Amino acid sequence: MKRLSELAFDNRFARLGDTFSTAVTPLPIASPRLVVASPAALALLDLEPAVADDPQLVEYCAGQCPWPGAEPRAMAYSGHQFGFYNPQLGDGRGLLLGEVINAAGERWDLHLKGAGKTPYSRMGDGRAVLRSSIREFLASEHLHALGIPTSRALCVTASDTPVWRETEERAATLLRLAPSHVRFGHFEFFYYSRQHEALRQLLDYVIGEYFADCLAQPDPYRAFFDRVLERTAALLARWQAYGFCHGVMNTDNMSILGITFDFGPYAFLDDFDPGFVCNHSDDTGRYSFDNQVPIAHWNLSALGQALTPFVDKDALLGSLKRFLPLFRGAWLELMRRRLGFTTAEADDRERIQRLLQLMQGSAVDYSRFFRELGDRPAAAALRRLREDFVDLAGFDAWAGDHLARLARENEADEAARRARMHAVNPKYILRNYLAQQAIEAAERGDYSPVRELHAVLSRPFDEQPGMERYAERPPEWGKHLEISCSS
């Protein structure tokens, strides 16, 4: 079994130099203990699940001793926050420890969130709190299990170090993994500070490391933008299809790799409400669920602006026109699968929109609807689901059309269709009230609920007998929890 001290670090981003990041030593937290660890994330580094019991893991994540081979750096970047440019950003509470190469040749950034003050902390203390660390851990691993591209979370470490937010809380750290931590905001930082040579160096670095196919294109920089756009469209299609609301889609929270990244006040839809706002600091609803696609387009235009020293503006505008068609095509295919279709018909989009309108009008639970649609033969499932709708005439019309649509699939094996639907429609979804209950237990020192919740959410499509309580409809109080950016 590989030991933590034997990880193969190769810190290429650190070698870019002090223009791009600053060397910082993690500040230790007091009396650290492991809250939860992900066996799946450990495996990405060729580590066995038993490594979670190694005291050295807590020591490294608590900043109590240096990780052999790591070169902790705070990355420099800026970004647009709620539509306004902020030049004073950067890693204010987290450090890129380094890059590890696993046995498959894959590179994984190790990023320690809550590592203490950095040159970019501004007025902050550089710490993360336990509740936000648990929320990111649970969401990262759950999104991965759902098939949604995301950063990963290896473990959460709690402590007795006090920190002040709205009230006194306890500091924690999160060890995050991602193929890269480069954000849209990295490019904006060098563009708006007019460091164009550094901008070129960053472009060459990310293309060489992550988009090598672009080097064969006539304009590698535009090709890079196209790849980022394509990945972002694919990501947004999955967010919208599975009812995920990020909550704070600032450009500094947008990954060049099209992965879910730096999410704090996130939520999955309970009742279907396209105008849902999960971040109670978002007074204008800029990052509401139904605004995520246009915001992603806006953020891509901000990235494109940062590339204008090297890419023709008209070419970038031409690329941006591809975003919505790419998103719509990917989203439509995902929704077809969720409804059990294997073929495509021209009016499928309209069919799906009619369903969503009916769900909105009746406040139907978004995730449970699709799961229950595959629980029984189609006609029986629709009879049960009819009970959840207010507009019965509208639902009956849609249900009749849906049965006719399924009949045109010419699929004789009903069981195969239902199994296929269960493979894409989760029984278990990370609801805010479940996360809150686990967090409250953890704050009392009981980590078993968060560990059990993580285990259940890591297999969201499986029945998991005995765990049905995690699949229940949320209580009314659980639908209205306010989540803030405070972390």
Curated annotation (Swiss-Prot):
Protein family membership: Belongs to the SELO family.
Ion transport found in the keyword field: no
InterPro entries assigned: SelO (IPR003846)
Gene: ydiU
Identification of the protein by name: Protein nucleotidyltransferase YdiU
Top-level taxon of origin: Bacteria
Residues binding Mg(2+), per UniProt: N253, D262
Source organism of the structure: Azotobacter vinelandii (strain DJ / ATCC BAA-1303)
Example of a GO MF term: AMPylase activity
EC code(s) of this entry: 2.7.7.-, 2.7.7.108
Alphabetized NCBIfam families for the sequence: PRK00029.1 (NF000658), PrtAdtaseSelOPseudom (NF045949)
